[in-house]
């Protein structure tokens, strides 16, 4: 599922919601466009293993505030992303750890994520055109 949300001070488009991913990924090109100093990355040495079994070593990890949903039914949460320098059609991937912490229910059929908030059920709608 493809969506947009606020990450730090930036409205990040082309975010992939991946229930199968065990990590949150921010691709280096998006990281650079956010004008974050590379010195803010926390070193990490654990490789990521892709679908084909290929290994990718992250440049580091960074924790950024992510805002999803429409006020007042929104979540604002610090999310740790692994920054990876490789090409991909998306700017970032939101993985299972974040979705679980939001208690989110995803529906690929409806291109929607629902999550509980203090003020009722929040909703995120995916981009149908981009999903094709």
Q: Where are the regions a protein language model picked out?
A:
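Aspartic protease core domain of the pepsin/retropepsin superfamily
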Residues: 19, 23-132
């Amino acid at each position: 599922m493809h969506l947009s949300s606020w990450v730090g001070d930036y409205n990040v488009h082309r975010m992939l919601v991946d229930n199968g991913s065990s990590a949150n990924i921010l691709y280096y090109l998006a990281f650079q466009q956010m004008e974050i100093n590379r010195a803010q990355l926390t070193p990490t040495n654990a490789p990521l293993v892709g679908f084909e079994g290929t290994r990718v070593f992250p440049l580091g990890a960074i924790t950024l505030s992510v805002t999803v949903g429409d006020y007042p039914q929104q979540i604002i949460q610090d999310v740790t992303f692994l920054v990876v320098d490789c090409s991909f059609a998306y700017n970032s991937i939101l993985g299972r750890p974040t979705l679980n912490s939001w208690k989110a229910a995803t529906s690929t059929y409806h291109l929607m994520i629902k999550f509980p908030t203090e003020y009722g059920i929040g909703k995120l709608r995916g981009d149908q055109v981009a999903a094709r």
